Amino acid sequence: MQEAQVDVKVQSTKTLVMSSQYDKEIAAVAHYMHNYHINDRTTYQKARISLLDSLGCAIETVSKSAEVRSLLGPAVPGSKIPNGFRLPGTSYVLSPVEGAFDMGILIRYLDHNDALGGAEWGHPSDNLGAILSVMDWISRSSAAGIFTHNGPPMTMHTLLTATIKAYEIQGCYQLLNAFNIYGIDHVVLVKLASTAAVSWLLGLTEEQTMAAISHVWMDGQPTRVYRSGEDTIPRKGWAAGDACMRAVHIAFLVKHGQPGSPGALTNPRSGFYVKTFGDKGFQFARPFGEWAIRNVYLKTMPVEGHGISSVEAALIQRERLQERGLGLKDISGIDIRTTAAANLIINKTGRLHNAADRDHCIQYVIALAFIKGSPPEPEDYADDSPFATSQEIDALRDKTIIRPDEQLTRDYLDIEKKSAGAGMTIYLEDGTTMEEVLIEYPSGHMSNPKTKKLVEGKFERNMRLKFDDGEIMRIKDALNEDSMRVHEFLDLFVRKGQPGSPRL
C-alpha cells in the first residue's frame, strides 16, 4: 500500500516549487489531497462501511431527536435553493453551506457515529457533513447545466476517495497533537480536513487549497467549554456541523478569488503557533496515507467512545452478579481503571444538568448498563427519561471510582495497538471482591471480530426507522456502484413531506 511521502516531516522539492512560501504543514495537506492515489480495494471497502454507518446515524438522529429537528432547514423559512443538497431523511433542499451544518448535526448529535483516539480525540465521519452537501450540490447543478465543474467527477468513487482522505487528515493530526490542552475543541480538525476535501471537490488548484487551509488557522477556534462540567450544553452536538459549514464557506470564498496567508501558522507576531499552540508546532507519527479509515472505531452503542469498554464490562459483571444470586444492592463499590483520555473527558461527579451532560458521564452510562441489563439508548439521556432523576442511578454513580491507568493509556496511544481498554472490579457488601473484567477491544473496534456484523445490524435498525427493507437493500447495492452520480445516491434517502421544523 502506497503511503504519501510528503508530510510535515519530509517535504519533496516538487511539493515546494509551486508555493514554497506556504507553511510546510499547510502545503503537506494540500499535496496529499491533490496528489495521493488510493489503489487498495480494502481501503475503499472500509470507506463504504463508514459511509453507511454515518448515514444510518443521520437517519437515527432525524427520527429520534425533536431537539435536532428544530435546528434543521433553511435559516430563512421558505427560501428555495435550485439544485440544492437533499438532506437525508427529510424533504429539505438546502444550500451547500447550510446543508453542511444540518448534515453535520445529523451524523454527530446522538454520539453514535465513529470515533478515533490519540493525543486528541474526534469523529472523522463528521467531515461527511461538508463532503456530502457540496458533492450533491455540484452533482445536481452540473447535471442541470447551471454550473461548470472542473474538479473530479461527482461519483460514488470520488465520494469514497474524499472520505478516506478527510479521515486521514483528521486522524494523523489527532495522533500526537493535543488541542484540548489549549482548551481548543477537536472540531478544529473537522474544519481542516473538510476544507481540504471540499477545496479539491470544487476543483480548486493545489495553490488555492493551500490558501483555503490557511484560513482555517486564521480563524479563532472553538473552545471546549461546551463539553466541560456544568457548562456542558447541546452545542457539543452541533459543533461539528458548525465546522463543516465554515469549511464549505471558506472553500467558496477562495474559489471566488480570496487569497490565503502563507504564514498562518508560523508568522512570528500573530501566527497560530506563537499565539495558540506553542513554538514546537504540530507533531506527526506517520505520513498521510490510508491509516485512519482502517483504524476508525465504529460505535455499536450511543455512548462516548471512551466509555464503551466500561459499559461492556458492566454488562458482564451484572451477569456474574445474577449467577451468584446477587443484585445491585449487594455492590459496595465499583472500581474502573481506564485511559487518561476517558478520565479527562467523561469522569463526572455531582449533578448532571442535561442530556449533553449525561451522555458524557462514564458513571451514568455504567449505572444504566447495570440497571437495564443492556447498553444505553439515546432516549435514556433525555431530561424526561426516568433515569435522569433515578436515585438508583445516583447511588451507583456515587459508588463508582474512575482511575486513569498508565498501561491502558500507553496502549491507547500506541499507533500499532490502539486499544480502548477499561477494567472493572466489583466490591461487595459482604467484603468479597469480584474478579476484574478487562475489555481492551470493545465492539466497534476494528480488532474486534464482531464489529462488522454489529455495525451492519446497527445500520439496518437505524434505516428501518424511515425506510422499508427494499429501500435499504437498494441503498446498500448503490454503495457499490462506483460510477453512480452522488445526487442519484442521495435521492434514495429523501423522505417527502417530512421536513421537520424549520429553525428560526
UniProtKB/Swiss-Prot annotation:
GO terms for molecular function: lyase activity. It is an enzyme of class 4 (lyase). Its EC number is 4.2.1.-. Induction: expression is induced under low pH conditions. It catalyses: (4E,11E)-2-hydroxytrideca-4,11-dien-1,2,3-tricarboxylate + 2 H(+) = [4-(deca-1,8-diyl)-2,5-dioxo-2,5-dihydro-3-furanyl]acetate + 2 H2O. Gene3D superfamilies: 2-methylcitrate dehydratase PrpD. One of its GO terms (cellular component) is mitochondrion. Pathway: Secondary metabolite biosynthesis. The keyword Protein biosynthesis does not apply. Keywords: Lyase. It comes from the Eukaryota. InterPro entries: MmgE/PrpD_sf, MmgE/PrpD_sf_1, MmgE/PrpD_sf_2, MmgE_PrpD, MmgE_PrpD_C, MmgE_PrpD_N. Phomoidrides A and B (also known as CP-225,917 and CP-263,114) are potent inhibitors of Ras farnesyltransferase and squalene synthase. CP-225,917 and CP-263,114 inhibit Ras farnesyl transferase from rat brain with IC(50) values of 6 uM and 20 uoM, respectively. CP-225,917 inhibits squalene synthase with an IC(50) value of 43 uM and CP-263,114 with an IC(50) of 160 uM. Belongs to the PrpD family. Monomer. Alkylcitrate dehydratase; part of the gene cluster that mediates the biosynthesis of the antihypercholesterolemic agents phomoidrides which are dimeric anhydrides. Within the pathway, the alkylcitrate synthase (ACS) phiJ and the alkylcitrate dehydratase (ACDH) phiI produce the decarboxylated monomeric anhydrides by coupling the C12-fatty acyl product from phiA with oxalacetic acid. The pathway begins with the highly reducing polyketide synthase phiA that catalyzes the formation of a C12-fatty acyl-ACP, starting from one acetate and 5 malonate units. This is Alkylcitrate dehydratase phiI. It comes from Fungal sp. (strain ATCC 74256).
